[in-house]
Amino acid sequence: MEGLEVKVLNYSEVLEDNFTYRIDAEFFKKIYLEEEKIIAKLGFEEAKNIIVVKGGKRLPEGHDFLNNKSGIPYIRAEDIKNGFVDYTNSPTISLLTHREIKAYQTEYNDVLMTIVGNSIGDIGIVKFNLDICNLTENAVRLITKKINPEYLFSFLESKFGQNYIERNKVGTAQPKLSIERIRKIKIPIVSSEFQDEIESLVSSAFEKLQKSKETYQAAQNLLLDHLGLKDFNPPAQAVNVKSFSDSFGRSGRLDAEFYQEKYEGYLKKIQAYPYGCEPIRTVCKLKDANYTPKDNQTYQYIELSNIGNLGEITGASLDLGCNLPSRARRKVSKNDVIVSSVEGSLASCAIVSEQYHQALCSTGFYVVSSEKINSETLLILFKSEPIQQLLKQGCSGTILTAINKDEFLNIPLPLVDANIQTQIADLIRQSNYLRIKSKGLLEKAKKAVELAIEKDQESALDFIKGKQTNDCNVH
């Protein structure tokens, strides 16, 4: 029996808070039962008594997303992660579509939770003010009535909230968490003073994240200004006449999309850069050799879902080599830049930090480094509108549209002035510093909630205010 977890329960205990009559051992793990007792001892309210739970809505039949960013944001599950809901990359819908699902809008200070799929249990708090913004059916809105939304957010992010979600989800291929289960979450009762302190931490985290985004945007603007592309409007004519020698004879492409005039407009501007430009194949070193993971060695594995909007790696899965997917074949090093090759996620680019040195990434990324352009400037270049458009132009395929190796290596990059590169690097480092500080404050709020539940609120308040405690390892 050594190594096995055994728990004997009375029939009445099995049925307690078990309206779906689950009898699988997974549901009665020791950790789940212990945490339930801790919360019961502290005192709690069921969610249904202090919050309103509302589902999202899928697009109505016959409606689709717009092909531009001028519409109404539609928050997806992937937009709800890393603490704050971000609609920067959300698809948009028309006003007509919105009117069909207007009952499913998000509002300021809503706490959003994903309830379907592998991302189930991701939590985000809405800190933007938009008149209209819709929510996917794969998430729910939690509207607080009697508690602070920041406290609710931090509790759900804590091990107590996440373990409840893990315990109560059902299904394997496509796990789900029912709204009824969410309404039965036991939320610990804490003082208004403690909730206010959590609110202060989360608000400070949001402010730092906003400054991080502004600093990142400053780096983007600096580059585009320097390249003369800040307010550039490419040609938008629907027809572009080409001879055979200037079309298929040169590119091997017959699809009309490839020959849109806007691509030529961006290309000419880059080629006119006074300090010159060179194709990626001569500016960068491409790391495309396959690495075969060792079966019994543990690796960090980075995939598309781990790339943030500010060019950062937000996390990685940890697993033995024998369990990794066949696409986990690229080994990355500190300061490498990884660039997605798949259309629809071409903007998923990131710098590899020290934390992910020697990690593996998907073969869906190109891994590059350069002696002519620093990593921070490479990142901003690859995420800039001109290079994004040229990457999109190079994409081909039917089932999985992506840019192949030759097309990628032929894209020209401007040899950005060294002084501008230094300024961009400084801005990106500032942005990263602020983002890490923001993440640390959210972690502190989460740990404080755990400490308040496991020990007492006084210890948690001391921890928040910087007094020493042995109960939590947060720096």
Please annotate each region the language model reported.
Residues 115, 123, 131, 136, ...:
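Ordered, small/hydrophobic-rich secondary-structure cores
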Residues 100-101, 172, 326-327, 355, ...:
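A structural connector/turn signal
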Residues 132-140, 170-193, 345, 359-366, ...:
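A short glycine-rich beta-alpha junction/loop motif
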Residues 1-59, 191-293, 418-475:
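Non-catalytic DNA-recognition/assembly elements of restriction-modification systems
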Residues 64-72, 84-92, 103-106, 124-136, ...:
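Short, surface-exposed loop/turn microsegments at beta-strand edges and helix-strand junctions
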Residues 60-67, 167-169, 234-239, 293-301, ...:
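Short coil/turn segments at secondary-structure boundaries
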Residues 76, 102-104, 112-155, 338-382:
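A short beta-sheet element
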Residues 44-63, 78-108, 278-290, 305-334:
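Sequence-specific dsDNA recognition surfaces
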